[in-house]
Amino acid sequence: MAAGPYSIDVNETDFTERVLAASAHTPVLVDFWADWCPPCRVLTPVLERLADEYAGGFVLAKIEADENMKLAGRYKLRGFPTAILFVKGEPVDQFSGARAPDYVREFLDRHLDK
């Protein structure tokens, strides 16, 4: 999937640097998605638009789950899409399934400094 100015594509190789270490400075919302998953095709554009709207308030890290099964297993994902917010190297909250922009905005606002 294409990455915008506030979103990146991440894999098992660069996860530690681009998610865990980077979240020490800026929260990172990880979007675990899969090509075969219709709800993923609904949620990812919502997350990309919000990443642009928040203009650096968080980084969106997109991870294709089928290609990165070790990461999906590490976080015990049970379905897709699943979004996990990392702050200071730790997962602080998550949600699963396609969600409306207002739901995701409220989720983010609970954890981000405004």
What do the PLM-derived regions correspond to, one by one?
Residues 1-57, 66-70, 74-82, 86-114:
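Proteins that catalyze or organize thiol-disulfide redox chemistry
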